Amino acid sequence: MGPPLKLFKNQKYQELKQDCMKDGRLFCDPTFLPENDSLFFNRLLPGKVVWKRPQDISDDPHLIVGNISNHQLIQGRLGNKAMISAFSCLAVQESHWTKAIPNHKEQEWDPRKPEKYAGIFRFRFWHFGEWTEVVIDDLLPTINGDLVFSFSTSMNEFWNALLEKAYAKLLGCYEALDGLTITDIIMDFTGTLAEIIDMQKGRYTDLVEEKYKLFGELYKTFTKGGLISCSIESPSQEEQEVETDWGLLKGYTYTMTDIRKLRLGERLVEVFSTEKLYMVRLRNPLGRQEWSGPWSEISEEWQQLTVTDRKNLGLVMSDDGEFWMSLEDFCHNFHKLNVCRNVNNPVFGRKELESVVGCWTVDDDPLMNRSGGCYNNRDTFLQNPQYIFTVPEDGHKVIMSLQQKDLRTYRRMGRPDNYIIGFELFKVEMNRRFRLHHLYIQERAGTSTYIDTRTVFLSKYLKKGNYVLVPTMFQHGRTSEFLLRIFSEVPVQLRELTLDMPKMSCWNLARGYPKVVTQITVHSAEGLEKKYANETVNPYLTIKCGKEEVRSPVQKNTVHAIFDTQAIFYRRTTDIPIIIQVWNSRKFCDQFLGQVTLDADPSDCRDLKSLYLRKKGGPTAKVKQGHISFKVISSDDLTEL
């Protein structure tokens, strides 16, 4: 069973189609009429628009002619390049386009049974976290007999024109499609999670290791059903569509249609002086201006391969506008990568995506307000919603996506464009369960771009630990909904922090409700004990308060360990000490290296401290070798930290 399906405008495709067939009429959609209001709310029409059905445009109309990816698409006089690029990308993976165009064979024209055609189509979009089915009629806007928006070079193929109309209906009108990015459109067509990679910032041409790591990620994404596109930025409008020295177009988005790591046979190793080739195949949605550099059809490299070589290696091209290029040339020529990961396929096992819908709301009470503005608003910033997640091991890449509810559908009513949004990421205590109130010790682990696009992204390789993500609008005091999605190779247990402090309950009142909150960061342990010169010391920390304990990751083979381990405790009294212990991780029995015992009173200094380790037995126990550096902050205001 697939995901729950929402019916846009509550229109039921099968019922509407049956009614039309019963009455012997073609469907005309009362919720998206063939009128100028369905086209624009601000722009002027360039001519008289006549709405025509496909059979009035072509003698032999079809939804799809042959293979969906075989024909080039044209943006039309009022269309946009991003839409054409997204269509081209969508056509690469059948699992995605068949989701956007459900039961396409059933929706197809059948000349043998014309009575079954009712002029009605349905398409599905991933809209703000829900799969939504949109029903349309087949009336398409034309000027002088030509389609106004996108059309296929196969003049009797209409899937893209009809899909574009359904998308326009979902967003309010055709004008609402203007300004959408290719990542916005692909996410709406597929439900994938997008990441935008700056090729120049990543220095993939300079750093060999990073280049091959990128190839590995792209290969994994593509083979798992992801969609990848790339573009060359143009510094000015005048340079849009200008051809580079190697035949590539600036300002256009190219679709990746294949990616291969090739092992060469003995003869080809001699020819190319390498045992492996890292290759990508790209397609220009316009079907022209192909790559003319190495591995192009006119290149020396290509000519040195026989037809059999190309077939055996998989270096084949099925469409006009397709070409192969090496990973090195790919990294050198393109500036931006749009990587849309397929996160909805259960075949791949592990739960890789976690998501939550939230909202920014306004309240006069600072503890209830959830619209605190960006990081610049230091007094109110932490009044935003807060979400915590856990990275279970070092070195996992985490992709974070924050999407605001698109306001384009309300522009007709005078509502503003999208808000400027972004988010901040903080590494927090390993046992945090309540909201952040001040940032005394937390490490700022990342920040997204702040921009008025629908979606902002951030990808980071994160260390093991807990992280709090704070989604924000740039200005405080605004209200809106948002969708937060986090993708990782391992589950990260995304959840919202809603409470400010421990709840009052019969249980904790009987045991004693907390009166003090204490936050501690252990920065390092240095000069640790070694019994003999070649002994291996693998230190780790435990931070204890009563029955609660936090344990740090193990540091390998060092007597000077950097931990930066954080913990927070809600204590009934300062008579319950905090004990920091250092241990040596060993195969059979861990070795105690020393401890520090702290009262952590609210009146204590909050600066960085350094204390010698001692044996067990309290603050007056015998001193041992080594010392730790730490910072402790205590407060009798449970909502300070």
UniProtKB/Swiss-Prot annotation:
Domain C2, chain residue ranges per copy: 498-621
UniProt-listed InterPro entries: C2_Calpain, C2_dom, C2_domain_sf, C2_III, Calpain_cysteine_protease, Calpain_domain_III, Calpain_III, Calpain_III_sf
Annotated compartments: Cytoplasm, Perinuclear region; Cytoplasm, Cytoskeleton, Spindle
Alphabetized Gene3D superfamilies for the sequence: 2.60.120.380, C2 domain, Cysteine proteinases
Chain residue ranges for the region called Domain III: 344-495
Entry keyword Cytoplasm: yes
GO process terms (BP): microtubule bundle formation; regulation of cytoskeleton organization
Coiled coil ranges: none
GO cellular component, one term: microtubule
A GO MF term: microtubule binding
Pfam families the UniProt entry points to: C2 (PF00168), Calpain_III (PF01067), Peptidase_C2 (PF00648)
Sorted UniProt keywords: Cytoplasm, Cytoskeleton, Microtubule
Main localization (coarse): cytoplasm
Residue stretches making up the Calpain catalytic domain: 26-343
PANTHER family: CALPAIN (PTHR10183), CALPAIN-6 (PTHR10183:SF381)
Family: Belongs to the peptidase C2 family.
Stated role: Microtubule-stabilizing protein that may be involved in the regulation of microtubule dynamics and cytoskeletal organization. May act as a regulator of RAC1 activity through interaction with ARHGEF2 to control lamellipodial formation and cell mobility. Does not seem to have protease activity as it has lost the active site residues.
Record note on quaternary structure: Interacts (via domain III) with microtubules. Interacts (via domain II) with ARHGEF2 (via the N-terminal zinc finger).
Record's protein name: Calpain-6
Organism: Rattus norvegicus (Rat)
